[in-house]
Amino acid sequence: MRILLSNDDGVHAPGIQTLAKTLREFADVQVVAPDRNRSGASNSLTLESSLRTFTFENGDIAVQMGTPTDCVYLGVNALMRPRPDIVVSGINAGPNLGDDVIYSGTVAAAMEGRHLGFPALAVSLDGHKHYDTAAAVTCSILRALCKEPLRTGRILNINVPDLPLDQIKGIRVTRCGSRHPADQVIPQQDPRGNTLYWIGPPGGKCDAGPDTDFAAVDEGYVSITPLHVDLTAHSAQDVVSDWLNSVGVGTQW
């Protein structure tokens, strides 16, 4: 199995390094990752400037100022030959649950892999300690995919509790929960008296029902949520069409 491995925490982050070491026990792994932390970069792509890469002695490649999406795009289309069989993103330091997937560079890297036609996994740890647990879970899923490919056309967003492996209760297939809107902004002043702003933490859990990713991880289960690239709200199409007809938009300007 040939694996393109990326992340949004940066090429030197413990999550990606732990996962790369574990995956290399049974797979051909090419790391292509940002040279720095790009958390929250979502699906952004660098279009107005060139991208420079640096290759380390072990073969890992850092993309200077690159986003996670840049890294997967370059990895698939230029840097990994032959091309990968699958794209894996992670292990992220911290969860990507509920609305987090909108902002997550970890999920975005997997989405780019799927958009380019490859199966893809996004892997996140609900903490910063037991990366070995998340790596073991990821390897188990990848070995299963080798035996029997999963042809859903979706990415798998995997969130792992920050627990020793023997304390993981199992796996649940879940849906995304949701958070309350975030509203915190943290102002500071620089030495010249100018105001700086920091984006605050995410909102608290809003929808954390028993079938959600939030609930699974809180209860000690690995959460696997199938995600797709299509953002169309199919169930709302008729509602919007009826509304346009009722208000006369499109018949007169």
Curated annotation (Swiss-Prot):
Cofactor(s) required, per the database record: a divalent metal cation
GO CC annotation, single: cytoplasm
Compartment(s) where it occurs, according to its Swiss-Prot or TrEMBL record: Cytoplasm
Broad EC category: hydrolase
EC number: 3.1.3.5, 3.1.3.6, 3.6.1.11
Record protein name field: 5'/3'-nucleotidase SurE
Pfam families hit by this protein: SurE
Note on cofactor: Binds 1 divalent metal cation per subunit.
Keyword field: Cytoplasm, Hydrolase, Metal-binding, Nucleotide-binding
Gene3D superfamilies attached to this UniProt entry: Survival protein SurE-like phosphatase/nucleotidase
InterPro entries per record: SurE, SurE-like_Pase/nucleotidase, SurE-like_sf
NCBIfam families linked: PRK00346.1-1, PRK00346.1-3, PRK00346.1-4, surE
Any GO molecular function: 3'-nucleotidase activity
Entry superkingdom: Bacteria
Keyword Cytoplasm (UniProt): yes
Residues bound to a divalent metal cation: 8-9, 39, 92
Database matches in PANTHER family: 5'-NUCLEOTIDASE SURE, 5'_3'-NUCLEOTIDASE SURE
Family: Belongs to the SurE nucleotidase family.
Record's catalysed reaction(s): a ribonucleoside 5'-phosphate + H2O = a ribonucleoside + phosphate; a ribonucleoside 3'-phosphate + H2O = a ribonucleoside + phosphate; [phosphate](n) + H2O = [phosphate](n-1) + phosphate + H(+)
Biological role: Nucleotidase with a broad substrate specificity as it can dephosphorylate various ribo- and deoxyribonucleoside 5'-monophosphates and ribonucleoside 3'-monophosphates with highest affinity to 3'-AMP. Also hydrolyzes polyphosphate (exopolyphosphatase activity) with the preference for short-chain-length substrates (P20-25). Might be involved in the regulation of dNTP and NTP pools, and in the turnover of 3'-mononucleotides produced by numerous intracellular RNases (T1, T2, and F) during the degradation of various RNAs.
